[in-house]
Amino acid sequence: MTIEFTDWPQDRAQRYRDAGYWIDQPLTEILHSRCQAQPQALAIICGERRFTYGELDTLSSILASRLAEQGLGQGDTALVQLPNVAEFYIVLFALLKAGIVPLNALFSHRRLELTAYAKQIVPKLLIASREHEVFRDDAYVQAFAEVGAAPAVTLLLGESDPAASLAHWIETPGSQPVAYAPTAADQVALFQLSGGSTGIPKLIPRTHNDYHYNARACADVCALNAHTRFLCAVPAAHNFLLSSPGALGVFHAGGCVVMAASPEPLSCFALVEQHEVNTVALVPSAVALWLQAAPAHRDKLQSLAYLQVGGAVFADSLARQVPGVLGCQLQQVFGMAEGLINYTRLDDSDEQIFTTQGRPVSPDDEIKIVDEQGVPVAPGEPGMLATRGPYTFCGYYKAPEQNASAFDAEGFYYSGDLVVLTPSGDLRVVGRIKDQINRGGEKVASEEIENLLVLHPEVTHAGLVAMPDEALGEKSCAFVVSRNPSLKAPALRRHLMELGIAEYKLPDRIRLIEAMPLTAVGKIDKKQLRHLVSVENTRTWLQTRLRQLIEDSEELDPEENLIFYGLDSLQVMKLAAELKARGIEVSFEELASTPTLASWWALVEARQKAA
């Protein structure tokens, strides 16, 4: 029995085999080959614990055998949620060896997400941590049963009862070894999670062949080798940290993964120094924190050679700081759990590295950039990204409607990204088509949050849009129409938390409005909501900037002439130039003719609306 999925057309599959991309070996071969070549080499450092490749192989085999003893194997699925600990990889290889297909949930996911995943895959096995709020008591049993997904076997990290203790099952062999085997190389190895725009992420079946090549190709582009010490500080379950090149790429190259609980700078800097880490992969929001903290701790980062940044668009202004502040080489990454991975190369020019998201890692990655009618756009013009290739999937799991809209007749997958092809052949990401917020690499589906907000008894309408943020790339802003004009933002966030959503999905900003703007066909006018965000952000920026320029500006009266606060002509010229740099076309003469904050707000809003 195998997991159903949409396979590659035979002609393309044969082409990928002929080119050597697909080698018809299971992902377990990554570990097996390392054990043959260097069984005593360090594979994982986790706190005070060390695991060689031989030990990783032995422990994962014990767990695989014990799971097989329970009748689990090919055709079964597992829901796994573990923090950044060595057990994550022990469990992963055990499941791959036993032919059990895992879905690795992020540790930030809560009851709502976990039960939705369980409903989709109906797992026979659940592996989680007592440290997580959902599993601190046994109420989760009923929650899973209510969605028709009660696992046959549950193993918990931190559980005291040996019968359900993950640690006990890993360390204690069964009464007798039981045979097990991975699924075939052209079958599903694991599920990844999409950054869905319609609520709970869709599931992405990844086969051994395509995922193995994904990790190998990225490892080659990033020049990983047996001397690589890779810091895993972003959630290990992320596709970025698992296979792009991530831990699987490091294991393929014979390097060592150093586990970090989070990307918090000071604790990570200590790990870099202690273990001579030379490579790290981070999302832009984490890099921003590292850049702030690094100047006072530069001596701890002497071994750091490479920084891979992905998960969200990395601002040029931050990218340019990396070599000087962190003392390492930057590689930008633009990838997706569905497949296509782009990297800047180690020998690219500074401008390519700082201002683009690189180019595909495989010679057989096919991309096209098209307009809304599917016509290719001119070079340098923004368009929708479509792709297919040897590690880009061919369909979401049991989702025919979504697949019909996500793929064209030629099998190209439309990611929802707006990109520009630069003269150097690199991609620059300029936006998204999907109704989704990319918050520091974590994807938030607007529709999901809107549907949950209107469950509040005092909310009649809700709309969620992205707003720009230098550190995170994007934050979320919720516009809410309420029956109660005194409804406060904390009450709405409390309502969302009580529904069991992940904390990163909470709106960063909540604004109550009298009426929801609608399009001609009665849908929420997201363009108008984004305009409201832009106007508010500009108002806030303008007021803050004036306070920086004016000495006596504690209480700025919007109707008072700013000259009487001490603002001079040179400062007005500077403001006009700064507004122009923000894309707002106003002249010095226009500002000088009506020098009040209220007039400037009105002028700027009119220009933004016109634009």
Swiss-Prot record:
Modified sites of kind O-(pantetheine 4'-phosphoryl)serine: 569
Gene: pmsE
Alphabetized InterPro entries for the sequence: ACP-like_sf (IPR036736), AMP-bd_C (IPR025110), AMP-bd_C_sf (IPR045851), AMP-binding_CS (IPR020845), AMP-dep_synth/lig_dom (IPR000873), ANL_N_sf (IPR042099), ATP-dep_AMP-bd_enzyme (IPR050237), DHB_AMP_lig (IPR011963)
Name this protein carries in UniProt: Pseudomonine synthase PmsE
Carrier domain mapped to chain residues: 533-608
Cofactor names: pantetheine 4'-phosphate
UniProt GO MF annotations: 2,3-dihydroxybenzoate--[aryl-carrier protein] ligase
Organism: Pseudomonas entomophila (strain L48)
Pfam name, any one: PP-binding
Known role: Involved in the biosynthesis of the siderophore pseudomonine. Specifically adenylates salicylate and loads it onto its peptidyl carrier domain, via a thioester linkage to the phosphopanthetheine moiety.
